[in-house]
Amino acid sequence: MIRRPPRSTPKPSSAASDVYKRQNKGPRMMCINGDEGEVGTFKDKYYLDTDPHRFLEGTLIAAHIVEAEKCFIYMRDEYPGIIKILREEVKKLIIKGFVEENFIEVRRGAGAYICGEESALIESVEGKRGIPRHRPPYVAQNGVYGLPTLVHNVETVYWIREIFEKGSEWFLSFGRNNRTGLRSFSVSGFVKSPGVKLAPAGISVSDLINEYCGGMLDGHKFIAYLPGGASGGILPASLSNIPLDFDTLQDYGCFIGSAAIVIISDKVDIKDVALNLMKFFEDESCGQCTPCRNGPTVDVNLS
């Protein structure tokens, strides 16, 4: 339980929070999804490694707003250093009296790609195999141990403190191409300066490369990119001016997802990229649905 100072509670803005808050009075849970398993994504690791306090402060604010009785921080198995940092910092919160013991529990992930899906994450938190649940009911209605559970991403709670301090108008003042806000892009591939790039929502990949990544590596020509990691699809360089945001890529059969931008050059065979992605999904499919269970294997065998 958080030791809450008396103050007015802002109204949650997300639809999931609204569903969560409408549930009957009683214990409610909150989970932070730190299972950063999408290929090419590393922004959560960067933020937690450089400023874990901001993340934890945002977590406490979010838990206070939705009146959560307990919070699980579910971290990727491949991030043992981050797990150690968070557990040490949570102990400090307890010692200083900011939270009661066991209010925040850092859980080590199961190492499976599918556990990044919120209902599979809930199953894993409960000690079960990480398999997506049938919905409805949604996790905001029936989550951890059957209790209403709100699932947030790491980046969502990471920005809460700054938005509280500077106001929503500050955050919404950023954006391009009729989009609003900031996005954290995990940029990798054949650029001079890869890494986590905080850029306006709606920026195009061409502007992202030139303004934030120093351009392409010398001797490399930009030919294609992954706008949303392994599951987000592949787009040619001829479509490099599309705004990057949550609802701008569907017409091209792609989506931004976790904003993992992988830049591909003319030194790489696109067929090899596609084959590598199919091998990844062949290995990581949870096997629940036939197209995903059998499709990647068929694609790999066709290559």
Regions found by a protein language model. Give the residues of each.
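Single conserved hydrophobic/aromatic residue that forms the stacking wall/gate
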Residues: 1-16, 20
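Iron-sulfur-cluster electron-transfer modules
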Residues: 14-129
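Ferredoxin-type iron-sulfur electron-transfer modules in oxidoreductases and energy-metabolism complexes
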Residues: 26, 34, 45-46, 70-71, ...
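Hydrophobic alpha-helical positions that pack around
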Residues: 26, 83-201, 213
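Short alpha-helix boundary/capping segments
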Residues: 43-54, 152, 197-200, 281
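Short amphipathic, charge-patterned alpha-helical segments
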Residues: 58-60, 202-217
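Active-site loop ensemble at the mouth of alpha/beta enzyme cores that anchors a bound cofactor
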Residues: 124-136, 238-255
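Short loop-to-beta-strand transition segments
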Residues: 215-229
